[in-house]
């Protein structure tokens, strides 16, 4: 699992946001097969 900042984590299958870690930031995460790409967040 890789941490991208602002509460965004990705592994080989999906990305997700830990809202506790994000602390109110809004992140757009696009999951792709074989990985994910974190979008630009707005805090």
Curated annotation (Swiss-Prot):
Superkingdom of origin organism: Bacteria
GO BP of this protein: defense response to Gram-positive bacterium; killing of cells of another organism
InterPro entries from the UniProt entry: Bacteriocin_IIa, Bacteriocin_IIa_CS, Bacteriocin_IIa_dom_sf
Temperature dependence (free text): Displays a high degree of stability when incubated at temperatures of up to 121 degrees Celsius for 60 minutes.
Gene3D superfamilies named among the record's database cross-references: 1.20.5.130
Gene Ontology annotations for the cellular component aspect, listed alphabetically: extracellular region
Alphabetical UniProt keywords: Antibiotic, Antimicrobial, Bacteriocin, Secreted
Biotechnology comment: Has potential for use as a biopreservative for inhibiting L.monocytogenes in seafood products that do not usually undergo an adequate heat treatment.
Compartments, as annotated in UniProt: Secreted
Stretches assigned to coiled coil: none
Pfam entry (one): Bacteriocin_II
Function of the molecule: Bacteriocin with antibacterial activity against many strains of L.monocytogenes, L.seeligeri, L.welshimeri, L.grayi, L.murayi, L.ivanovii, L.innocus, C.divergens and C.piscocola. No antibacterial activity was detected against L.lactis, P.acidilactici, P.pentosaceus, L.salivarius, L.delbruekii, L.acidophilus, L.plantarum, L.casei, L.rhamnosus, S.thermophilus, P.freudenreichii, B.breve and E.coli.
Family to which the UniProt record says this protein belongs: Belongs to the bacteriocin class IIA/YGNGV family.
Name of the molecule in the record: Bacteriocin divergicin M35
């Amino acid at each position: 699992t890789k941490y991208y900042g602002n509460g965004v984590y990705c592994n080989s299958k999906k990305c997700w946001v830990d809202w506790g870690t994000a602390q109110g930031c809004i992140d757009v995460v696009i999951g792709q097969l074989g990985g994910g790409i974190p979008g630009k967040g707005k805090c």
